[in-house]
Amino acid sequence: MVEQRELEPTPTKNRTIVERNSERELVVTRTFNAPARLVFEAWTRPELLKQWWVPKSMGMSLLSLDADVRTGGRYRLVFSHDASTMEFFGKYIEVTPHSRLVWSNEESGDNGSVTTVTFEETDGRTLLVMRELYPSKEALDAAGTGAADATVETFAQLDELLVTLGARR
């Protein structure tokens, strides 16, 4: 079962592709017009992550972000939406600078996913592949298309941030 959606490109002309590769795995790919070092920093430096991680259209705000970005380190994000809060937390399983991040998503207990993000640079551009592996089909179904749509929006926001960062560096 491969389900694929390709969304409209942003001003940089890059598309985000969302694929459900199996009953348990969701894969999101996008090329960014920035070196892997810069894209990786946007994922691992809290002051940068805060600028793009929250989908603007969803009316959410990021109340707090704690991240010890190293193998074995922990993270915790607290969001506010419609007068309620949501927490996301887990552990960094692998951190390989400028090439790979792997973390657990523990807020759902045994139904948590494992996220792997790879950064592959070619000619100053970075192919980012994000794989979310869920423990079951039901867990992935429960995440629904909302999570995929949010990721598409946040990747567009990341694209905008990288353009700004590239102009500053």
Q: Which residues make up each language-model segment?
A:
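Hydrophobic/aromatic beta-strand elements that line small-molecule binding cavities or substrate pockets
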Residues: 30, 64-67, 88-94, 105, ...
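Hydrophobic pocket/interface hotspot
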Residues: 39, 49, 75-77, 92, ...
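Beta-strand/loop substructures that line and gate deep hydrophobic ligand-binding cavities in soluble
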Residues: 3, 25, 102-153
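Hydrophobic ligand-binding cavity/cleft-lining segments
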Residues: 1-59
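Short, flexible helix/strand-to-coil boundary loops that buttress conserved ligand/catalytic motifs
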Residues: 43, 53, 79, 105-107, ...
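Short beta-edge strand/loop motif at the mouth of beta-sheet-based domains
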Residues: 27-28, 47-85, 169
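Short, highly charged C-terminal tails/helix-capping segments
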Residues: 162-169
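Short, conserved beta-turn/loop elements at beta-strand boundaries and strand-helix junctions
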Residues: 96-101
